[in-house]
């Protein structure tokens, strides 16, 4: 049975539609002297786009299968995941409750009210603030219990949509990459932001089956490699088991030099990467995920960290709405 047939066994809503574009960044390639391509998951159809919609195709299908009427999730005030979950809930006629934290402890009005947070109000989300997501799985379980006691039927969507079920969305993305690149380009490396780990794990499983000679590099956005690796491997192994395939921890490569000072705080290298791609390609990155991941790609070229000189694919996971929340830093 092919990977595509195995994936088709899982309930899935069609939220993404057609494959997202895979394009060569010609001006950036000329500037860097290296072939750079981009997978445009920032232009998925709903709520200004982003990678979480792929995960929500499977998670929301499971919620409907279970008869849920409420999606419950958590994240930072400027969470792209919460924004996309809220939009899916609105599209499906479901209630959405979001447990939010302020991970950078800022009182800047733009961060607290603009960007993704503004969109949550438009999507009519019930927002519950907390001091911090120290144990998000437990905190979400407790919140779901309270919501259930009010007569609702909650479905918990994990932080980032990152569990083995949500990560199926990035096996689908790997299928798209393989189909779009076939006969056109052979990627030496793929670079992606690695945060809640589901996107990274899904790509790890999918690419190992479809493009086993391609190196996958996760640029961490919130923690050091020794903390991130177990998170990626845990989802990778659960996902591989559910699909009946083999995917080994040896395929998990992490670069952790680019997320300082902490998750959610922009840094100089990330902001420079945002500016570079905007000026050369008219494409918007974000200061939390893709800006830092692109900074890793650029520095990786400078430091000759890639294993060879072949073409590189950058996975654009979205996040541009957060730009407005980080003004005037951006």
Curated annotation (Swiss-Prot):
InterPro entries: ACCD_DCysDesulf, D-Cys_desShydrase, D_Cys_desulphydr_bac, TrpB-like_PALP, TrpB-like_PALP_sf. The modification N6-(pyridoxal phosphate)lysine is found at residue 52. It catalyses: D-cysteine + H2O = hydrogen sulfide + pyruvate + NH4(+) + H(+). Its EC number is 4.4.1.15. Its cofactor is pyridoxal 5'-phosphate. The keyword Lyase applies. Signal peptide: none annotated. It comes from the Bacteria. Pfam families: PALP. GO terms for molecular function: D-cysteine desulfhydrase activity. Keywords: Lyase, Pyridoxal phosphate. The keyword Lyase applies. Belongs to the ACC deaminase/D-cysteine desulfhydrase family. Catalyzes the alpha,beta-elimination reaction of D-cysteine and of several D-cysteine derivatives. It could be a defense mechanism against D-cysteine. This is D-cysteine desulfhydrase. The lineage of its organism: Bacteria, Pseudomonadati, Pseudomonadota, Gammaproteobacteria, Enterobacterales. The gene is dcyD.
């Amino acid at each position: 049975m092919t990977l595509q047939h195995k994936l088709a066994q899982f309930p899935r809503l069609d939220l993404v539609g057609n494959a997202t574009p895979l394009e060569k960044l010609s001006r950036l390639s000329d500037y860097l002297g290296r072939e750079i391509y981009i997978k445009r998951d920032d232009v998925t159809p709903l709520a200004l786009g982003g990678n979480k919609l792929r995960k929500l195709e499977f998670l929301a299908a499971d919620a409907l299968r279970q008869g849920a009427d409420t999606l419950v999730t958590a994240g930072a005030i400027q969470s792209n995941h919460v924004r996309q979950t809220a939009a899916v809930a609105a599209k499906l006629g479901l209630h959405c409750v979001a447990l939010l934290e302020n991970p950078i402890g800022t009182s800047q009005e733009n961060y607290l009210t603009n960007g993704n947070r503004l969109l949550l109000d438009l999507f009519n989300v019930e927002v519950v603030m907390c001091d911090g997501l120290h144990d998000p799985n437990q905190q979400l379980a407790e919140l779901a219990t309270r919501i259930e006691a009010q007569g609702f039927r909650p479905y918990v969507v994990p932080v980032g949509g990152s569990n083995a079920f949500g990560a199926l969305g990035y096996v689908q993305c790997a299928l798209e990459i393989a189909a779009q690149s076939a006969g056109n380009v052979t990627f030496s490396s793929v670079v992606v932001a690695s945060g809640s780990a589901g996107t990274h794990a899904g790509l790890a499983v999918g690419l190992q089956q479809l493009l086993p000679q391609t190196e996958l590099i996760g640029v961490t956005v919130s923690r050091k490699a020794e903390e991130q690796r177990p998170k990626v491997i845990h989802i990778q192994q659960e996902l591989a088991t559910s699909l009946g395939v083999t995917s080994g921890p040896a395929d998990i490569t992490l670069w952790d030099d680019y997320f300082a000072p902490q998750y959610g705080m922009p840094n100089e290298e990330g902001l420079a990467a945002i500016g570079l791609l905007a000026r050369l390609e008219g494409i918007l990155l974000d200061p939390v995920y893709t800006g830092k991941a692109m900074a890793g790609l650029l520095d990786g070229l400078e430091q000759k960290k890639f294993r060879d000189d072949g073409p590189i694919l950058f996975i654009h996971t979205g996040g541009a709405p957060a730009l407005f929340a980080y003004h005037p830093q951006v």
